[in-house]
Amino acid sequence: MSTQTNTKSDFSELDWDKQDGLIPAVIQNHLSGKVLMLGYMDKAALEQTLATGDVTFFSRSKQRLWTKGETSGHTLKLVAIDKDCDNDSLLVQVLPNGPTCHKGTESCWLDGNAHPFLNNLAELIASRKGQSPESSYTASLFARGTKRIAQKVGEEGLETALAAATHDKEELVNEASDLMYHLLVLLEDQALSLSDITANLLARHQKAQRK
């Protein structure tokens, strides 16, 4: 997927003197919002990151520039970068190519989710797959198969639309919640996730911006 880098910050205002020429850079998955890692950049690392689109750090242990994934291939493609209000740290949004942590995990934190409930709900739904239909409503949906799950998505979509048409906001919230839940079940049934949907929406957005 091609990326369109968004760099609206004025990096000339960065305070490089506060930490001996280094600035911490928080790395965040652009699609999921998950925090992946923390690295440090000097001026050269920031310039190389902006020039190449591959996130580059200054390695304090190796005392040189280090492009993430230069040996593993697990690169971080730059999408957007911004500085904080004190001009002494960076938020770098990326599209990761493989696991970010050197231990082979997606994140260097056990739980780096920006929106943990939806992710946790999706994981809970996935855990119900293959369980006894009597154990939960979700398990019973999986047992009844794709057609029934798809039917429920259609029903909840119609009920959501009707709630909006009648300007019943309380019912709209309830029906939209039902729709979201059943959509997550359908995505899991088809071996897809919210990240797949987000990636597709991002690609469409970038295509529209290029026109």
From Swiss-Prot:
It catalyses: 1-(5-phospho-beta-D-ribosyl)-ATP + H2O = 1-(5-phospho-beta-D-ribosyl)-5'-AMP + diphosphate + H(+); 1-(5-phospho-beta-D-ribosyl)-5'-AMP + H2O = 1-(5-phospho-beta-D-ribosyl)-5-[(5-phospho-beta-D-ribosylamino)methylideneamino]imidazole-4-carboxamide. It comes from Shewanella oneidensis (strain ATCC 700550 / JCM 31522 / CIP 106686 / LMG 19005 / NCIMB 14063 / MR-1). In the N-terminal section; belongs to the PRA-CH family. In the C-terminal section; belongs to the PRA-PH family. Residues 1-117 are annotated as: Phosphoribosyl-AMP cyclohydrolase. HAMAP family: HisE, HisIE. GO terms for biological process: L-histidine biosynthetic process. InterPro entries: His_synth_HisIE, HisE, PRib-ATP_PPHydrolase-like, PRib_AMP_CycHydrolase_dom, PRib_AMP_CycHydrolase_sf. One of its GO terms (cellular component) is cytoplasm. Disulfide bonds: none annotated. Its main location: cytoplasm. This is Histidine biosynthesis bifunctional protein HisIE. It is found in: Cytoplasm.
